[in-house]
Regions:
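Conserved P-loop NTPase motor cores
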Residues: 312-314, 450-474, 478-484, 497-504, ...
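P-loop NTPase motor domains
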Residues: 35-53, 276-279, 292-299, 380-381, ...
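Extended, folded cores of ATP/NTP-driven motor/assembly subunits in large transport
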Residues: 1-410, 420-421
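Short glycine-/polar-rich loops that comprise or flank the Walker A/P-loop
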Residues: 53-56, 109, 490-492, 517, ...
Length: 816
């Protein structure tokens, strides 16, 4: 039953001397694709299958395992900076928590494709005939040796080289349409051990030794080494196999397709994609495809047509009515004949086998029922042929033959392409900051926020900026805090603008990094007067001048298009910039010195703000020193008593205190420019909570673009936390945002706007439903590669949950 005779690189010889070349199809992301994008993938796969006019194709979907510990260890290598020790300790604790929750390994579906290499006809001459006869004789001798001694298998080097040349051509053809990787000896070893019931080994950690002895004209391998991965006790029952190893046993059952009773309409027929999400247990699938070339297929179809016509005539002569089955079959056969005749396409004999394994018989029965129900819903009827378990088991082995002809389905390339082979949901990176897990597949999601600017192959953006959008209470602040916290642990530096003063207790709740947390709380205390004056806070005088003009025009409502007032104000600000003592109070003095009706008017207007509530923070007389330092790893700037306007309030309706509040946000955000221009080798984050407050005013919008552009050059990401995607969806900003997080929203217009912001079909009802039905802590994530999926944010640690929770205490007690 063991079909493999010899393995060399990715080539496998079977006992019938057929040679298959095996590749791993690198999975492609399939979630949230539009119908058009799905059809593009479908066409590529159809062409991949149709390019082989003859031969066989073996497709395998195998549930392999990947090690959580090795991913976490790789993540530790990314940590730098002052908090390296704390970060590594945190990652170790995280690893232990994850392992205790989901085990050492997580299921990772891999897709393998084997193509039979067809020998090109050699020229018929005496030399080739002699060579062929000699090879046949040698083959006979080796077979005798093998039968008597059962010790080694030999393969002529000429034969190996000949097939390797053919494989190179094949690989070249395949890789034009899909990303593939040639299989290696370790892959074959893992595949065989997996099929014979071994698990608990991570795919990347597995090693398989197959020593070769290269002689002058041939290469030898020990037969024992070849079959070593299959060692286990197999006990065959009617409908399952029992696989016993030294330390454990498992039960395996095989299904095959009996009939497809309805139409499998694309794009909703992607069985390979949906079964990854449907089952909580691993399921393997094998497709053994034999290509029936066009002429042969047409002959078969025409013969079948004659049979059906005979049945029809027989019924007519007997005076009875032809059954509806025969009439339907005649219609289908006519359609198929026309189709094959016009397209000149091949037909495919498909043997489709599903492998289900479990640790005990009861669990196996439950899993088998679940698999059967899933396929039933897709109009595919499965059977477990009694007594054929070992034969169906052998179909999964590389280079194996079709075991049974009773369950063959005749299909076209369209059908095979529509099964979604290689489709999966991928999100984020393979290592980095653990943010949570994919809701659909359960796979861990890792992010590396600083990666965008590195120009990694496959990324669709090089923007470091990120957006967190969603209605109140969905979890956007929590997710944002978690990402900033881990970015700081991994060696980054951050400034958080905290207008609602929600992060003031972080020194107490995050004791391990308390020494690196700097909280700047700007109260309306008289001692803080002038601390937010543009001339005090900005290092660069030119930046201070432009910020001063922005703030004063914002407060007074003077437009740069106002030919009377704006030049007067501009002149006064320039005079202060050029003087030795700089401060906004001097601008008022300068305007009074001008002593014209317009300048006095502007001076009085500005002066009316100076003693209003906490406005004195903005006005200094030039003697105030900058007391805000951003040298720590995590800096939080809070301004007490800020009153932010409602989301829907227009600029004209802003009250005086709202105007002042927004102008302070603009000053602090501009101050972040200095922070961005610090050490370029360190990844920096400027986190703007309640970003909508200044994104909705012209000065704030200009500033946000400036921050984002400066950030890209200086390795700094600007994080916008806002309630509506419309705030960050303006073309100038939208194209400069990399990572996107969208939390629950119930307003249909907002949902459509968010989907459009993510670049996915906004009118697709399924997409709208996904966003509407998100639970707290779940978000739609778009990564740097443009892939979209639903993620459950997972803080792992209780203390982080409490530290970043922004719900009021009363509500929290109710929840508990």
């Amino acid at each position: 039953m063991f079909p493999i005779k010899y393995i060399d690189n990715n080539l496998v010889w079977n006992k019938d001397n057929e040679v298959f070349a095996y590749y791993e199809l690198i999975p492609y992301n399939y979630s949230f694709l539009s119908a058009e994008q799905k059809f593009i993938v479908h066409d590529s796969f159809r062409q991949l299958i149709a390019q082989s006019r003859e031969g066989k194709i073996h497709a395998l979907q195998i549930a392999t395992e990947s090690s959580i510990r090795s991913m976490q260890e790789q993540s530790k290598k990314l940590v730098t900076g002052k908090l390296k020790e704390v970060a590594c300790q945190k990652i170790d604790e995280q690893t232990e928590a994850l392992v205790s929750m989901i085990g050492d390994n997580q299921v990772d579906y891999r897709f393998f494709l084997g193509f039979k290499l067809m020998v090109t006809e050699e020229q018929l001459n005496l030399k080739n005939i002699k060579k062929s006869a000699w090879l046949t004789f040698k083959e006979f001798l080796h077979e005798v040796n093998h039968t008597l001694m059962n010790d080694f298998v030999s393969m002529p080097n000429d034969e190996i080289n000949r097939y390797m040349k053919m494989e190179k051509l094949l690989e070249n053809k395949i890789s034009r349409r899909f990303k593939v990787r040639r299989l290696e000896i370790n892959d074959f070893g893992y595949l065989m051990e997996h099929l014979y019931g071994r698990d608990g080994i991570a795919y990347e950690d597995y090693e398989y030794q197959l020593p070769k002895k290269k002689l002058n004209k041939e290469t030898l391998i020990k037969y024992y080494d070849l079959i070593r991965p299959t060692r286990c006790v197999i006990e065959e029952s009617q409908r399952y196999l029992r696989l016993e190893h030294e330390d454990k046993e498992s039960y395996v059952s095989y299904f095959t397709v009996n009939a497809i009773v309805g139409e499998l309409d694309f794009p909703s027929s992607e069985i390979f994609y949906f079964q990854q999400q449907q089952f909580t247990f691993p399921v393997d699938t094998s497709m053994n495809v034999e290509i029936v070339e066009n002429r042969k297929a047409l002959t078969t179809v025409r013969n079948k047509k004659k049979e059906l016509k005979d049945l029809d005539n027989h019924a007519y002569q007997a005076g009875s009515e032809t059954s509806s089955n025969v009439v339907d079959a005649l219609d289908s056969v006519d359609e198929l004949e026309t189709d094959l005749d016009q397209s000149k396409e091949s037909m495919y004999k498909l043997s489709y086998v599903i492998r289900v394994s479990a640790p005990d018989l009861d669990e196996l029965k439950r899993r088998c029922d679940e698999v059967k129900d899933f396929y039933d819903d897709l109009n595919v009827k499965l059977v477990r042929p009694a007594g054929d378990m070992l034969g169906l088991h052998s179909e999964f082995l590389p280079a194996s033959k079709r075991y049974i002809n009773d369950y063959v389905q005749y299909v076209k390339s369209d059908f095979l392409a529509g099964l979604g082979f290689g489709a999966t949901q991928q999100l984020g990176e393979t290592t980095g900051i653990y943010m949570g897990y994919s809701v659909d597949t359960g796979r861990n999601v890792y992010l590396q926020p600083s990666l965008a600017s590195q120009g990694v192959k496959g990324t669709v953006t090089n923007a470091l900026a990120s957006a967190f959008v969603g209605s109140l209470g969905g979890g956007k602040s929590f997710c944002n805090n978690l990402l900033v916290y881990y970015s700081v642990l991994f060696g980054g530096q951050a400034v958080i603008l905290d207008p609602k003063a929600e992060r003031g207790n972080w020194r107490e709740t995050l004791p391990e990094i308390a020494h690196e947390i700097n909280i700047v709380n700007l109260t309306s205390d008289k001692d803080n007067a002038g601390l937010l004056d543009p001339f005090v806070i900005m290092k660069n005088v030119k930046d201070a001048e432009s910020l001063a003009i922005d703030i004063l025009t914002f407060l007074t409502g003077i437009s740069s298009r106002d030919g009377e007032k704006f030049p007067v104000l501009r002149k006064a600000v320039r005079s202060v910039t050029q003087s030795d003592s700089r401060g906004l109070l001097h601008v008022i003095d300068e305007l009074r010195r001008e002593d014209t009706p317009i300048s006095r008017n502007i001076a009085d207007h500005i002066d009316s703000f100076t003693d209003y509530d906490f406005a004195h923070l903005l006005f200094s007389d030039g003697t105030v020193e900058n007391a805000i330092s951003l040298d720590n790893q995590l800096n939080i700037i809070q301004v007490a008593d800020l009153v932010l306007p409602d989301k829907d309030t227009t600029f004209e309706e802003y009250t005086t205190i709202e105007l002042l509040s927004v102008s302070m946000l603009i000053v602090i955000s501009t101050f972040a420019l200095d922070f961005i221009h610090s050490d370029r080798s360190i990844f920096k984050i400027v986190d703007l909570d309640e970003a909508w407050a200044f994104l909705n005013v012209a000065q704030g919008e200009t500033l946000s673009n400036k921050l984002v552009r400066a950030g890209r050059a200086m390795q700094a990401g600007v994080y916008f936390v806002t309630q509506s995607s419309g705030d960050v969806a303006k073309e100038s900003l939208k194209n400069n945002i990399g990572l996107k997080f969208a939390f629950r929203s119930t307003d249909i217009n907002e949902i459509k706007q968010t989907l459009e912001f993510f670049g996915i079909d906004k009118d697709d009802e399924n997409n709208q439903k996904r966003l509407r039905d998100l639970e707290n802590g779940q978000c739609l994530l778009q990564d740097l590669y443009g892939r979209v999926g639903v993620v459950q944010i997972h803080p792992v640690f209780e203390e982080l949950l409490h530290a970043f929770d922004t719900r009021p205490p009363v509500q929290r007690n109710e929840v508990e």
